[in-house]
């Protein structure tokens, strides 16, 4: 052993013990012939006292090994900020294991550094306690989840990383196959179809901490490769899966955040979430809610509202407490805020703090009757501001108000940052239009293997826009941290879904033939959930980005500053991999039987 003790483990009870420590020089202080060194390893920091002649060569981040006696610090010199603050090690021997060049990044929790430099020298960044503790927390989260699942007789099973591409879901990352030029593997977007095959195979309780890959456009706080806790169960109902999800999440929050989640976690239907919060992942830490005014404002002459109502659309409002105190510049700034989200603007009325009189551009266009009852209709008080959205499409207007609700909470300091608010969003739509046109076809909101609920299973073709699915998402503080569904296991129902989606038998066979073949042989009823592991760990760590809980994350643009990936390949590599090769006609003819399609992802 290079060392006998961890630096962070030393306590007053170790006084008089001779120890050997190994780690990095976090800090050195010279005191007239004596040098004090803060020695850091993975467990913490211990103070080491060395003679100047022994330690004059030491610099920050040198990797060293010391042997010495643990002694109590002189009275008054204790450091209550450190777990080891009552003791120090008087060194008898010092060995420099390796030297450190001048540092491009300060290894100091008190000094902020830019994201680019932190990612470029991530290995130095991880020596800081904040980033290191985030990864330790993630490791503990993995252990806790595994414990919960093993207590319930789940099997941890790995599924393929190299699979077959399919146009379903997001774009795939593709891998050329050297031994079969012109053919490609795809990296999985999730283990979705493989875990369903495991259910057919009798592996009734499956889980996996799964690596997933999606070639998406650049989006804030997304990574091209990510992790989900993937779960599938046979012979279960929606309630069974939700109960398991709650067991995992409540154990995680109790042990890692010290928070006891009240169970059962509240459930809200998808349509109620959109109507009340303008979002299918509502933040319930504050109580501001949307109000629909379509019926209240029916008959108005204000063209913006009247046009939406006549088109069978939606008019709604959200209240900003104390919003009337905003300056004209601040109120006008809301228009820029709305336009940045693709809207034409955000109409508003402010209520005078003294009289409650409605003022503002919209107030001039509403009748006296509508103005008189407006405050009561939306639950506003004198001094508040009321923001409106209207449109022929209800969802777009609701989502604009939902985004305004979040921004109102931020600007008005309504969010208790120490609070935790969870909910399940259930009864999601089964289908949505491919385009805004009424003639447009249908697509599955989740994926084409999601089961319609009992009310709709025999008649979803009658009104696809109103059909509901056995689908459920779990939300924490406005973040979707997991989602899943009960799957279709009946061949006749699956065929009807394919028919509605415009997937021909040939296309279904080409994309999912192996799954449909498996479903001929007695598939059990089954369902599952995928928990977004990066986001869950981010919340538990109190981090602002999922990058903080990933060992070697990429930038928003998918670039890795540490390795400079992605990089071009050489002409020789390109030739060897067969990147430019064309598949032989026989291979194209056999595409429908070439093997498993790339999985379609649970939303996370």
From Swiss-Prot:
It comes from Salinispora arenicola (strain CNS-205). L-aspartate binds at residues 168, 214, 446, 487. This is Aspartate--tRNA(Asp/Asn) ligase. One of its GO terms (molecular function) is aspartate-tRNA(Asn) ligase activity. Belongs to the class-II aminoacyl-tRNA synthetase family. Type 1 subfamily. Residues 192-195 are annotated as: Aspartate. ATP binds at residues 214-216, 223, 480, 532-535. Its EC number is 6.1.1.23.
């Amino acid at each position: 052993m290079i060392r006998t003790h961890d630096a962070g483990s030393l306590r007053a009870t170790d006084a008089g013990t001779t120890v050997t420590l190994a780690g990095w020089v976090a800090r050195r202080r010279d005191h007239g012939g004596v040098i004090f060194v803060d020695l850091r390893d993975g467990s913490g920091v211990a103070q080491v006292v060395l003679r100047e002649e022994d330690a004059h060569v030491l610099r920050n981040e040198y990797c060293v090994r010391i042997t010495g006696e643990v002694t109590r610090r002189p009275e008054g010199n204790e450091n209550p900020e450190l777990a080891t603050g009552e003791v120090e090690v008087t060194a008898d021997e010092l060995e420099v294991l390796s030297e450190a060049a001048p540092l491009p990044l300060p290894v100091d929790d008190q000094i902020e550094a830019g994201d680019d430099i932190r990612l470029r020298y991530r290995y130095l960044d991880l020596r800081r306690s904040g980033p290191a503790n985030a990864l330790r927390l993630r490791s503990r989260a993995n252990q806790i989840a595994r414990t919960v699942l093993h207590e319930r007789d789940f099997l941890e099973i790995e599924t393929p990383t190299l699979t077959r591409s399919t146009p379903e879901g997001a774009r795939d990352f593709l891998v050329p196959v050297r031994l079969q030029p012109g053919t490609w593997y795809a990296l999985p977007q999730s283990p979705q179809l493989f875990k369903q095959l495991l259910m057919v195979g009798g592996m009734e309780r499956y889980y996996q901490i799964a690596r997933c890959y999606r070639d998406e456009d650049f989006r804030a706080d997304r990574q091209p490769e990510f992790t989900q806790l993937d779960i599938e169960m046979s012979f279960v109902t929606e309630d069974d899966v939700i109960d398991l999800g709650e067991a995992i999440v409540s154990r995680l929050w109790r042990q890692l955040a010290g928070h006891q989640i009240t169970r059962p976690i509240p459930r809200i239907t998808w349509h109620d979430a959109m109507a009340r919060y303008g979002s299918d992942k509502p933040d319930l830490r504050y109580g501001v809610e949307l109000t629909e005014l379509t019926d209240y404002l029916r008959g108005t002459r204000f063209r913006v509202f009247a046009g939406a109502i006549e088109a069978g659309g939606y008019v709604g409002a959200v209240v900003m407490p104390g919003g009337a105190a905003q300056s004209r510049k601040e109120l006008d700034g809301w228009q820029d805020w709305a336009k940045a989200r693709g809207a034409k603007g955000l109409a508003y009325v402010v209520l005078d703090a003294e009289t409650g009189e409605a003022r503002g551009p919209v107030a001039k266009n509403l009748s006296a009757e509508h103005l008189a009852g407006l405050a009561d209709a939306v639950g506003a008080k004198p001094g508040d501001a009321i923001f409106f959205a209207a449109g022929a499409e209800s969802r777009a207007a609701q989502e604009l108000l939902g985004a305004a609700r979040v921004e109102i909470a931020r600007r008005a300091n309504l969010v208790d940052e120490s609070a935790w608010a969870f909910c399940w969003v259930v009864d999601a739509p089964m289908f949505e239009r491919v385009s805004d046109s009424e003639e447009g076809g249908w697509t599955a909101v989740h994926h084409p293997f999601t089961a319609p609920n009992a009310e709709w299973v025999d008649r979803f073709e009658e009104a696809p826009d109103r059909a509901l699915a056995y689908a459920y998402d779990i939300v924490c503080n406005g973040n979707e941290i997991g989602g899943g569904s009960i799957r279709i296991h009946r061949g006749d129902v699956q065929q009807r879904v394919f028919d509605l989606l415009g997937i021909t038998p040939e296309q279904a066979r080409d994309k999912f033939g192996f799954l449909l073949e498996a479903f001929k042989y007695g598939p059990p009823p089954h369902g599952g959930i995928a928990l977004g592991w990066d986001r869950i760990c981010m919340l538990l760590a109190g981090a602002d980005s999922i990058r903080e809980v990933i060992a070697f994350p990429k930038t928003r643009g998918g670039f890795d500053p540490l390795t400079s990936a992605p990089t071009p390949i050489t002409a020789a590599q390109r030739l060897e991999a067969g990147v430019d090769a064309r598949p032989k006609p026989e291979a194209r003819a056999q595409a429908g039987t070439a093997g498993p399609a790339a999985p379609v992802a649970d939303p996370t």
